[in-house]
């Protein structure tokens, strides 16, 4: 598969182990649309992960399913993968799991050399509301799962809850607080339990039993405040709430009809996007509501904001059957699940009746299984293989190779951290015996001399790699280059003694080439007086000479804590000269800069020179193309 050069949200290898879910959670659209459930053969999963990790170079992999814990072969597959990949320093993560199926066998296969967090989804704080949801989870099972997690070293657990469910009362909302308090108290003998809560607002989804129910935004805000007040005295709990405005838009779009197509386009054109990001919330909400009003759908939107559909009220008045007969915009779509069955299941929900999982118990007659869509496929679990003793990645340092490399073209647009990840994955794919650091989070022993600013090409950079076994330098260069883009070119390689000081201690100077262009008709920076006449070669030469002859070049910036500071940069300026212009570059001036670099990596950047030259010339300047042409080391 394709491996991106930049960090993505789910930056790991992902392999599907089970498609479909028959748990029957009544709010869950994927669980209704993907029936029946079908397990993947365990050996196929193992082969896909093993080959995928070797071909991609990822250090993490995830086994994907709507309910991973219902894949009965998970313990056997997990142990076998840990055994086969023990020497590769990789970690296994799983999505949100069924806490009632979380046991020691699953806890032992999670993580690896690194341990990720655990996420469970009780959904509701009382047994009655969990039965309405058809969660199939008891308080005892929740406590047992949390205690198992703590016994295996997990003292921080993430829990998902939902408010606004059909039939919910204030007692159910406060039950979330009681559940968290009870878990902390009953696990106190195992240590301090830290809980991260995500409180989502229920939004109905088509093709689910809860598609006929909604809650007003006013009621959501009241219930959120009720929770905030009740959780405030508790320690060790962090809580995130979903923006009510986002939930209202999600409800409207999720249950809309074909009239929404122009609304979606108009909202996007008005600036909607990344709607769930807090910095985008105000802009996105304004874009969506404006697009809805412009389409003449504001009345429908406000009706949903006020809780236009309430299955609980219809159930209380005995009108639920007629209420569920109303036509819906998606009735013409056949998901495989009968609409009549969804209405019946809504009635069962409001009566707090539970429907068992048909993958492991009797058929619930939802209408899916048959000759067209098939039946549930549940593969009996193979025996769990004996786990091999844990093996730390090779940390011996036998040899060190120093590479000169160039980073050009589109790769100049990836960050320094992304460059390090790119190199690490290329090393893993190459199969070279790289040496890892020790400790809780082992990493390949690689060092890049000096980070390149984003957007800057580097024509002669330095990279040190330590290996756990002898490696021929040229063979290592060829194998590593085969796993890299041509835009990250390994120019040369040489063996250096392990006792050689690190690259950061050996850098003496950096050579830059950059272009500057005057910006006419702009106010000049203070204190120089404005001068919009042409910047002649003589004025350029005089400006460069003035900087080289200056005794002080102060630079104001901020430290890591955001406090203003002033640095003296004159000692870093070694040389500055004009490059004879090429044809066609009439307005641009190309400069060569040599700047000293100290042991902490402090130096000059072309942007510093742009600022000072603007002041000397009395003319605003724009920085053009920038290259770092060479890093000079002590040995160069």
PLM segments and residue spans:
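Short, charge-patterned binding micro-sites
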Residues: 204-206, 434-467
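Core RNA-modification/binding signature centered on pseudouridine synthases
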Residues: 395-398, 413-414, 419-421, 526-636
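Canonical Radical SAM [4Fe-4S] cluster-binding loop centered on the CxxxCxxC motif
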Residues: 7-43, 365-378
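Conserved SAM/AdoMet-binding glycine-rich loop
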Residues: 50-196, 200
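Radical SAM enzyme core and accessory elements
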Residues: 234-392
């Amino acid at each position: 598969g394709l491996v991106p050069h930049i960090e993505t949200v789910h930056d790991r290898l992902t392999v599907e182990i089970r498609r479909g879910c028959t748990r029957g959670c009544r709010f869950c659209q994927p669980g209704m649309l993907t029936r029946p459930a079908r397990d993947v053969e365990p050996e196929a999963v193992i082969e896909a992960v093993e080959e995928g990790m070797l071909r991609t170079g990822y250090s993490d992999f995830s086994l994907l399913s709507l309910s991973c814990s219902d894949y009965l072969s998970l313990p056997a597959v997990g142990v076998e993968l840990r055994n086969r990949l023990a020497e590769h320093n990789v970690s296994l993560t799983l999505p949100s799991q069924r806490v009632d199926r979380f046991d020691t066998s699953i806890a032992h296969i999670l993580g690896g050399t690194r341990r990720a967090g655990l996420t469970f989804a009780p959904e509701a704080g009382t047994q009655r509301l969990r039965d309405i949801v058809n969660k199939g989870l008891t308080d005892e099972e929740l406590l047992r799962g949390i205690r198992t997690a703590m016994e295996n070293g997990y003292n921080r657990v993430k829990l998902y809850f939902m408010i606004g469910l059909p039939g919910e009362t204030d007692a159910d909302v406060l039950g979330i607080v009681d559940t968290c308090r009870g878990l902390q108290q009953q696990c106190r003998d195992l240590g301090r339990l830290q809980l991260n809560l995500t409180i989502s607002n229920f939004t109905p989804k088509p093709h689910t039993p809860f598609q006929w129910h909604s809650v007003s935004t006013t009621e959501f805000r009241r219930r959120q405040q009720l929770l905030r007040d009740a959780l405030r005295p508790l320690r060790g709990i962090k809580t995130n709430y979903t923006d009510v405005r986002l939930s209202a838009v999600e409800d409207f779009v999720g249950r809309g009809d074909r009239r929404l197509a122009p609304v979606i386009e108009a909202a996007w054109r008005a600036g909607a996007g990344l709607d769930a990001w807090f910095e985008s919330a105000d802009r996105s909400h304004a874009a969506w509501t404006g697009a809805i009003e412009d389409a003449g759908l504001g009345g429908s939107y406000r009706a949903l904001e006020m809780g236009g559909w309430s299955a609980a009220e219809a159930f209380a008045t005995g009108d639920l059957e007629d209420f569920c007969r109303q036509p819906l915009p998606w009735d013409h779509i056949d998901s495989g699940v009968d609409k009549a069955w969804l209405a019946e299941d809504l009635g069962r929900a409001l009566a707090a009746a539970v429907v068992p999982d048909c993958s492991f118990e009797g058929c619930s007659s939802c209408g899916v299984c048959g000759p067209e869509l098939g039946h549930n496929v549940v593969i009996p679990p193979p025996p769990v293989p004996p786990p091999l003793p844990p093996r730390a990645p090779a940390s011996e340092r036998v040899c060190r190779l120093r590479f000169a490399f160039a980073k050009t073209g589109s790769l100049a647009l990836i960050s320094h951290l992304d460059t390090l990840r790119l190199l690490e994955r290329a090393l893993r794919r190459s199969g070279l015996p790289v040496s890892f650091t020790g400790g809780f989070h082992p990493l390949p022993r690689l060092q890049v001399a000096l980070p390149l600013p984003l957007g800057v090409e580097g024509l002669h950079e330095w990279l040190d790699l330590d290996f756990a076994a002898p490696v021929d330098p040229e063979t290592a260069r060829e194998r590593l280059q085969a796993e890299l883009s041509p835009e990250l070119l390994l120019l040369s390689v040489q063996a250096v003694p392990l006792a050689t000081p690190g690259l950061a201690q050996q850098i003496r100077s950096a050579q830059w080439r950059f272009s500057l262009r005057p910006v006419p008709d702009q106010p000049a920076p203070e204190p120089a007086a404005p001068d919009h006449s042409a910047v002649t070669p003589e004025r350029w030469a005089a400006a460069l000479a003035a900087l080289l002859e200056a005794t002080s070049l102060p630079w104001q910036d901020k430290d890591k804590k955001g406090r203003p500071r002033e640095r003296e940069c004159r000692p870093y300026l070694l040389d500055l000269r004009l490059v004879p212009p090429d044809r066609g570059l009439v307005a641009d001036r190309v400069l060569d800069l040599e700047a000293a670099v100290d042991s902490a990596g402090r130096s000059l950047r072309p942007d510093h020179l742009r600022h000072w030259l603007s002041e000397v010339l009395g003319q605003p300047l724009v920085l053009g193309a920038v290259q770092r042409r060479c890093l000079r080391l002590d040995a160069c």
